[in-house]
Amino acid sequence: MLAAAAAIVVLVLALPPTGAKAQSAQDRELLLKAAFLYNFAKFVEWPTGAFAAENSALTICVHGDDVFPVIAQAMNGKTVGKRSLSVVSRPRPPASAGCHISFIGANEPESSYVGHLKSPNVLTVGDRARFARTGGMVGLVTVDN
């Protein structure tokens, strides 16, 4: 009886905690990119008029359904100065109205965003090698992963 109880305790201790998820390599990479976006938000100075009010949130628009959940969760509850961060998902083509940072995921077709990169007061960040060459401001590129 004691051996059976000990075996049950060992099995219970070996189980992962409820709600625990293994982090994939892609999720770890997205968390790193979210950290870059957060640091960009901390160090960019937006022009007068970029915010509706002094206490308006800083909005990061994420274009790409495959990357939105991880980035949104990583930014949850964060602030930049006195501003809260708001992370929203935007459909194709990227609508940049109300965005301060526009992040375009690697799976978004180039044709869906190229014409929308010249929005005033918006820092455009893309997850592909040619992003900066096609009019984006910051291109995040993985080299020798």
Where are these regions (language model features)?
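Short hydrophobic alpha-helices and adjacent helix-cap/hinge residues
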Residues: M1-N145
